[in-house]
Amino acid sequence: MKVEIYTDGACKGNPGPGGWGVLLRYNGREKTLHGGEPQTTNNRMELMAAIKGLEALKRPCEVDLYTDSQYLQQGMKEWIKTWKRNGWRNSKKELVKNAELWKSLDNLASIHNINWHWVKGHSGHLENDLVDALANLGIEELS
């Protein structure tokens, strides 16, 4: 099954209250998801959005995942292989930040065939604007 997933994370303060939003599109249908955490970072919410989107898939899929986070996109396309090879340490030999989320995302990604796409945020991209609003709703619902 071919699936499009659009993801976004948001944070009020960094760290601070954060939210994530997801749009899944498949077989002409759409499903949205959102949530939040009271104390987190923007990067953690970007990762959580991708994790929650992939967790929603019930079987292996062909996935086009769209994010406005270069951290997420480059992490999955470029950096993660080196991190794994180096025991989850970066080029400075420091432990990778958010390693537990990266590991979870890597495990989920291994189930699917994923193309990771970067889109410019806040540029009138319809789906990105929708998941941005969902991420902010995740923050609002915390209070």
Swiss-Prot record:
PROSITE patterns: RNASE_H_1. GO terms for molecular function: magnesium ion binding; nucleic acid binding; RNA-DNA hybrid ribonuclease activity. Mg(2+) 2 binds at residues 8, 132. Its main location: cytoplasm. Residues 1-140 form the RNase H type-1 domain. Binds 1 Mg(2+) ion per subunit. May bind a second metal ion at a regulatory site, or after substrate binding. Mg(2+) 1 binds at residues 8, 46, 68. Signal peptide: none annotated. It catalyses: Endonucleolytic cleavage to 5'-phosphomonoester. Keywords: Cytoplasm, Endonuclease, Hydrolase, Magnesium, Metal-binding, Nuclease. InterPro entries: RNase_H (IPR050092), RNaseH-like_sf (IPR012337), RNaseH_domain (IPR002156), RNaseH_sf (IPR036397), RNaseHI (IPR022892). It comes from the Bacteria. Endonuclease that specifically degrades the RNA of RNA-DNA hybrids. This is Ribonuclease H. It comes from Legionella pneumophila (strain Lens).
